[in-house]
Amino acid sequence: MTSKPLEHVADIEKSLRHIAAIIKQKGREILNQYAITPPQFVGLQWLYELGDMTIGELSGKMYLACSTTTDLIDRMQKNELVERVKDPADRRVVRIHLLPEGERIIQEVITKRQEYLRDMFESFTDEEIAIFEKSLMKLQHEMKRK
């Protein structure tokens, strides 16, 4: 594969950065309707997608120190969004479990974020959306691979 012209890569990087910032801002506006912080949302999102996790596993996914994640979980447990449960296979292991209220909030927030994106795609044809989705998935795959 030949090297892509740097100006195209620079334009794509700039567009992705701007899109990410807009989505992040819109996501925060949506989160302001709920009693959770952006880091709590990220933690809830990982638990929703992957199921019960240890503090260490969640810390790794969130790129946070275990002590920071512990404080985050303490606050979410106090608000009855998550609970700590002993692993039945190894009682020394404690897993973080998403409670119904945490699941409700994460589902509502994700739905509102998806509705926002759907509105942004109103002027796109079905073919453009399919190509865009395929390209994003390919980029994500390459980024995970390297």
Curated annotation (Swiss-Prot):
Q: PANTHER family, from UniProt?
A: TRANSCRIPTIONAL REGULATOR, MARR, TRANSCRIPTIONAL REPRESSOR OF EMRAB OPERON
Which spans are transmembrane here?
Answer: none
Concerning SMART domains, the annotation shows: HTH_MARR
Protein name listed in UniProt: Uncharacterized HTH-type transcriptional regulator YsmB
Q: Which UniProt keywords apply?
A: DNA-binding, Transcription, Transcription regulation
* Glycosyltransferase recorded as keyword: no
A Pfam family of the record is: MarR
GO MF annotation terms:
DNA binding; DNA-binding transcription factor activity
Residues forming the HTH marR-type domain are: 9-141
Q: Does the keyword DNA-binding apply?
A: yes
Q: Write the gene name.
A: ysmB
What is any one GO biological process for this UniProt entry? regulation of DNA-templated transcription
Whose protein is this, by species? Bacillus subtilis (strain 168)
Gene3D superfamilies linked to this entry: Winged helix-like DNA-binding domain superfamily/Winged helix DNA-binding domain (1.10.10.10)
| InterPro entries reported in the protein's UniProt record | HTH_MarR-typ (IPR000835), WH-like_DNA-bd_sf (IPR036388), WH_DNA-bd_sf (IPR036390)
Q: Which residues bind DNA?
A: 55-78
